[in-house]
Structures are given as C-alpha cells and as structure tokens.
Regions:
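Short, charged, surface-exposed secondary-structure boundary motifs
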Residues: 1, 15-17, 88-92
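Conformationally flexible catalytic loops at phosphate/diphosphate-handling active centers
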Residues: 1-8
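Beta-strand/loop-dominated core regions that host nucleotide or nucleotide-derived cofactor-binding catalytic loops
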Residues: 10, 17, 26
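Conserved alpha/beta-domain cores
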Residues: 35-243
Length: 243
C-alpha cells in the first residue's frame, strides 16, 4: 500500500513522501492552523477603516449549506452566491422550484443580511455536462455567462422567477456576470421586468425594488463604469477575469 500526502495550498501530491517531506508538510499544517487561530480574534470586531468608514465584510459561497460558515464566521452577508454550482451539481437544468428552494433557504437562514445572487455564469472554465457550448479559441472572453442567458431566454427567466420568488423571504439582489455593453444590461433588465409582471399577474409575492448589479470583469465595462452606473444599482469587481 502507498502512503499519500497532499499539499492543499499548491495542489501537490506526494506518493510515499520522505521523512523530510512529511516534516515540511506537518510544519505547513501547523502554520495554517496558527494563521486561522489568529484570524479568529477578528471575528466579532467591527469592520471599518482607520478613518472610521464602515466596510461590509461579505462572504462568497457556492451552495446553500455554506450559510453555516457565513454565520459562524460572523460575515455580514453574502457578496456572491455562485448559482452556477446548482447547475454544475445537477444532472439536468435545475427547475424553478429547485432553485427557489435553494435561494429561499439562503435568504431565510441569513434573515435580513444582504445576499447577492449571481445569475448563471458558465463558459470559460465552467461547463455543464448536459449543455453543449461552442469550441472557441478564447472561451473566457467568448460565449459565456449573460450572453448564453440572453440567447436562452426561457432558461434565464426560470432562474429570475426563482430569485424573485425567494426575494420575498430575505434581502436578495441580482448580479449579472460578464456584461460587456449597455445593450446587454438593458436587455437583461427588460427580461427581469417581464418576469416581475408575470409574477404580479399570478399574485406571487416578490421584492419589487430588488437591486440589480453587474460584474465588472471586462476592460471595456470598467472604462464605461460611469455609463453603467446610471443603468444599475451596484458593481462587483471581478478581478480574476479583469486582470
């Protein structure tokens, strides 16, 4: 039998590590433990700058169960719920009801804390096994995220209906990924308005003034920030893609 050790920070795998490698990994484990213990001291402290400005410290999560960590680490809410994991962890497109229950669970668990739900962000390095995407030379800047949703309006509407319905149970916001033009943003907002009208006709409760924001992760969007600011309620800087 082989003995395997893993460095979770670098992704390195050691098969039958030497005594020296075991010592090094043990020291790394202890160092990480100490760093975590050091951070624990700040859990219940107020988050503000030296000159007194309040700063919201929000978590990024990928599944509803992560809300337990949000609460235990005293975060002030969720700045990014990666809804694509609901799709990636499913054998088929999640239904409106399945999504609604997931978003509702997060909203209720966090009560009135802010929760920002990013709409489906696939493409690039994130694929769905049940949805075929075109092969591209540079998929990170190609057919992905909001572009896929605007081409598949029924898919987009299903998710928006679920988010809006769940917004009746907490402080939810909608965030649109990889928006590259004002036209894309306006088209998405029009679809959201259409869904609102449908829900009103069906007498289904939702937060009528739900905030809509965008991810700024394309250089052209960053350059046009002032124009985009007139069309949406907030930005989230997507440094991974932007840089």
């Amino acid at each position: 039998k082989d003995f395997i050790a893993i460095n979770g920070t670098t992704g390195e795998i050691f098969v039958n590590p030497t005594e020296e490698e075991c010592v090094e990994l043990g020291e790394l484990k202890e160092k990480l433990k100490q760093e975590k213990e050091e951070l624990e001291k700040y859990k219940n402290k107020e988050t503000k700058t030296i000159d007194g400005h309040k700063v919201e410290l929000l978590s990024n999560i990928g599944v509803p169960e992560d809300t337990e960590l949000v609460i235990s680490n005293t975060a002030e809410g969720v700045g990014l719920f990666r809804s694509e994991f609901l799709y990636m962890n499913s054998e088929n497109f999640p239904t409106e009801e399945q999504q609604f229950m997931a978003y509702k669970k997060i909203a209720q668990k966090l009560q009135n804390k802010k929760v920002v739900i990013r709409t489906l962000d696939i493409g690039g390095d994130k694929d769905l096994k049940y949805m075929e995407l075109p092969k591209e030379q540079n998929p990170f800047l190609g057919y992905r995220a909001i572009r896929i949703c605007l081409d598949n309006i029924a898919l987009f509407k299903t998710q928006i209906r679920a988010i809006l319905r769940a917004s009746a149970f907490g402080n939810l916001s909608i965030m649109l990924p990889m928006v590259s033009s004002i036209e894309e943003l306006r088209e998405a907002k029009d679809i959201i308005e259409d869904v609102k009208k449908e829900l009103e006709k069906q007498n289904i409760a939702f937060k009528k003034d739900i905030k809509i924001g965008i991810m700024v992760e394309i250089p052209s969007t960053a350059i046009m920030a002032e124009e985009f600011g007139k069309e949406c309620d907030f930005f989230s800087i997507g440094t991974n893609d932007l840089i």
